[in-house]
Design a protein with these regions (language model features):
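A mid-sequence, solvent-exposed acidic-amphipathic segment
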Residues: 170-217
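Secondary-structure boundary elements
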Residues: 112-116, 206, 233-236
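C-terminal soluble interaction/assembly domains
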Residues: 213-270
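Short, well-structured alpha-helical interface segments that form or flank functional binding sites
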Residues: 99, 208, 223
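N-terminal post-signal-peptidase region of extra-cytosolic proteins
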Residues: 86-90, 103, 195-200, 215-217, ...
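N-terminal capping segments
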Residues: 33-184
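Short, contiguous, pocket-lining structural segments
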Residues: 92-96, 205, 219
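Secretory targeting and sorting signals
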Residues: 3-31
């Protein structure tokens, strides 16, 4: 998945940012050097950190569920990251609106953080390879989370079903010979997915709350078209995600969501 753009398909996110636009105009004076964070985002961050600190100790899945739940209702916003092959990358913290991938970024960084400074530092490790805030080292694809070292997640897709399918991709390549993201190379990668019609009760039982589900892309230049989190909710499994169609972060019944996509790629966070 390239970071989110809506023109490639009718899903909420497609994971590619072809253009990157600035977020809100007002940037906090308290922001650390090199960090772009609005006053509203700074306030949201402090509130979230306080809520997490007050939450009872929980296992990894419950911790992920709690943190991801803090974003429910947050407005959807595309193109919040800043940087391209021709524009310097900025370390953006935008918690007042999120797309499918920035939502995942912020949840993962919050899971690792007890303070504002820790969050800002951990977000660099989540979003960028080698801790280098640059367009070239941004993790543009969903499967970068498992393919980059140190890995943020393990790709568990193949172990979920005997019907899992492996396919060879050339990430970032277009059918016309161009690339989705100018200035970045084409990345050969094997992507494994479970076709939606094969995601039965047995497969769902092997998913864990906090797993990230990517909607498999038929396009050979993309790995997935949308990303969200699996939650084993009391009323049934849901897909928690930032939806452009609904305009906010929502829970969608997993069975309903599976009916709209070709298959799932599943990454299990290492923490």
């Amino acid at each position: 998945m390239l970071r989110c753009i809506k023109t490639l398909c009718r899903l909420a996110c497609v994971g590619v940012v072809l253009t990157t636009l600035a977020g809100a105009a007002t940037v906090s004076a308290a922001a650390a050097p090199g960090v772009r964070i609005t006053d509203g985002s700074d306030q949201n961050l402090q509130s979230m950190l306080a809520a997490i600190a007050d939450a009872p100790n929980a296992d990894r899945g419950a911790h992920a569920e709690y943190i991801s739940r803090l974003f429910l209702g947050t407005p959807y916003g595309a193109h919040t990251l800043i940087g391209s092959a021709t524009e310097p990358e900025q370390h953006v913290v935008e918690l007042e609106r999120v797309d499918c991938f920035t939502y995942a970024d912020y949840v993962e960084a919050l899971k690792r953080s007890d303070s504002r400074d820790e969050f800002i530092a951990n977000l660099v490790g989540v979003r960028y390879k080698n801790g280098d805030v640059s367009f070239e080292n941004r993790k543009h694809f969903f499967t970068d989370w498992s393919a980059s070292a140190p890995a943020l997640a393990t790709d568990v897709t193949a172990g979920l079903s005997d019907n899992a399918v492996q396919t060879s991709k050339r990430l970032n390549s277009k059918d016309d010979g161009g690339v989705y993201l100018p200035g970045l190379p084409v990345v050969p990668r094997t992507v494994t997915y479970v076709p939606s019609e094969q995601v039965d009760d047995d497969v769902v039982s092997r998913l864990a709350t906090g797993d990230y589900l990517g909607a498999y892309a038929q396009d050979g230049g993309l790995d997935v078209t949308h990303v969200g989190m699996f939650i084993d909710a009391p009323d049934g499994p849901v897909f928690r995600h930032a939806s452009s169609q609904s305009g906010r972060v929502i829970d969608t019944p997993l069975s309903a969501y599976l009916g709209t996509i070709d298959g799932i790629v599943v990454l299990r966070p290492v923490m």
